[in-house]
Each structure stands twice: as structure tokens, then as C-alpha cells.
Amino acid sequence: HFEYSLQPGKRLFLNFGAVNYEAIVWLNGKHLGRHIGGFTPFNFEITNLLNEGTNSLVVKVDNKRLPEAVPTVNADWWNFGGITRPVTLIEMPATYIRDYYVQLAKDDKNMIEGWVQLEGSDKEQKITLDIPELKVKKEVTTDANGYASFLIKSKPILWTPENPKLYAVNLASETDKVSDEIGFRTIRTEGTKILLNDKEIFCRGISIHEETPYYSGRAYSKDHAHTLLSWAKELGCNFVRLAHYPHNEEMVREAERMGFLVWSEIPVYWTIHWENKDTYQNAEQQLCDMIARDKNRCNIIIWSIANETPHSETRLTFLSNLANKARSLDSVRLIGAAMEKE
């Protein structure tokens, strides 16, 4: 139960960091919706559903493993169920900045590209991008769909594991503003070499599960992330594989601050039902959600689409479609998978 006094002209969203695995949500007896997948965020607008006094929130969660699910019934990690990441109320203006992207252009260390997307009735607005340390200030105007893109010449200090440089980035519309810490780097391959900022890098790393350091349960906080990553740092790592599912946002951001390259993965694990269309749609949705949340995290260099999946033609089609989807959403980062020997 909770009470909330919403300011006139504002909108309110109920955000879940993650719920494992199937979540059905009601507010004040009204069915808000259903979410499948235990490792990505989702939200509902509740602006017009609030009571003046006490509000009642009910979440029904089922973490039962199913053969057609992603992951499937056989996976070698603890299947912690329930609400595993923070639940928050987010108040927004009537027209707000729904999403944005700010990174280096592909293979160009001197060009920052990006876009912003507004949501609401007043979609045509002036947008200001401000990166004070780089003396970058760019104004663009969104179109009738609330979208605007930009391309800016600049020479930022490039993010590396040795110098994980991040810049304060501010985006402001006429009705909303957001701030972020963003790093800039290029990533590509040349034969069998991985090139970070056009220099070959050797990735020294380990796999980490999203489990609390000192007791049983899902890790979810900045402190959890810092402890786990500090142990990786003690081992001499510059790279972590966040296995085998999208980890919480605190983990990804702390890894970025601490100088860890990241392999980020969806739980297409072992014996997925390759022929099942719903299974594919589930996997693709988790991939899209992972990329949408973390597209501005420069330390992520690999979107991983699978782990140790037995060879078959149906698997090849399934994974090829996922790889193509990832490339359609992100033409810069590498696409990978951990494969069984074939």
C-alpha cells in the first residue's frame, strides 16, 4: 500500500527493475498488465488510476521454469523468484524525454552522434544537448513524432579500462530534462583482433552471476556491484561477462566507472525450443529490452545472443535472426555467443 499526491499536469509511472519470471500487476483492482522475462525492466503508466488516499498494488509472480521459456527448464544458476530489483514511482511532465542515445559515430573518434525521443501531446520542441567539459552545446528541434537526431564534431578523451573517462551529458527539452554520465570509445574487429579505440586489446576476464556477495539472493545494489567487481579487479581483470542474462543497471554502470569492458547477454541457454515462434519472440524481446536500457553504456562491447547451444539448422536460423535484430538496433557493438565445439 502507498499514498501519492500527484502534481497537476504531471504523469506517474510504476517501474519494475525486474521480476522473475512472469509478473501480473494490479493497482487498486485494475489490471495493469503482464510481463514475461526475469531480467529486464518494465513499467506501466498509472496517472489516471491513483486514489486520493491509499493505493493498493498487487503483483503476482511465478518463477516456474517452462520448456518453451527463455531460459528453459535446465539452467545452472539459482532460480531466484519474486521482485528481484527495485520498484519505483517516476513522476514525469505531460510531455517528457522518453529515450535518448549519445555515443561516438561508428569508427569515428571525432564525431558524436545521437537522437532524442519525446513522448506526449507536445511533441515539437527545441532540444538542447550540453556536454560542458567538451564545450558542446547543440540545439535541435523534434519533428511531429517527437524525434530529433544530431551529429557533432568533438574530440573527447576516449574511455579505456585504464582511464574510464565519463562526461556529464545533459539533455533538455522545453518541458523536461535528463542528465547522464557517458563515455566515448570505438570498438571493432580486425581478423581475430579486438580493437578498442583502434588499438588491439586483450580481454582478461571472468563470468559473474548476479548473486549477492555474502548471502543468498539476487544482487541489485551499487554496493553489491562494487564488491563483485572489486574481486574481479583483484584478479587482474579488465573484462567481465555478465552471465547469463541482463544484470541490473547498477552493475553495468559500476563496471563502466571501474573500467571493465562488458559482455552482456540474454538467457538463450542450452536447449531452447528453436522451432517455437513464441520462444523466439520472447528471446528477441529480451534482447531489445537489454539493448534499449544499456545502449549508452560505452563499456558494453558485446551483445551476446546465446550460451552453449547444441548445433542444429533450427538453432542457426534462430540465432541468425537474433544477430540480425541486434545489428538493426546497434550497428557499432560486436555481436557474440558462447558456442559449443562443433
Annotate each PLM feature.
Residues 289-314:
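Active-site groove signature of glycoside hydrolases
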Residues 240-248, 272-274, 280-281, 310-313:
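Acidic-and-aromatic substrate-binding clefts and catalytic sites of carbohydrate-active enzymes
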Residues 275-293:
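Ligand-binding grooves and catalytic loops that recognize ribose/phosphate and carbohydrate rings
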Residues 210-214, 269-273, 305-308:
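A short, mixed-charge helix-start or loop-turn motif at secondary-structure junctions
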Residues 220, 278-282, 314-318:
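Alpha-helix N-cap and loop-to-helix initiation/capping positions
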Residues 340-342:
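Substrate-binding cleft/loops of secretory-pathway carbohydrate-active enzymes
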Residues 1-254, 258-262, 286, 301-302, ...:
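Secreted/periplasmic carbohydrate-active enzymes, especially glycoside hydrolases
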Residues 207-208, 266-278, 326:
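Substrate-binding/active-site clefts of carbohydrate-active enzymes
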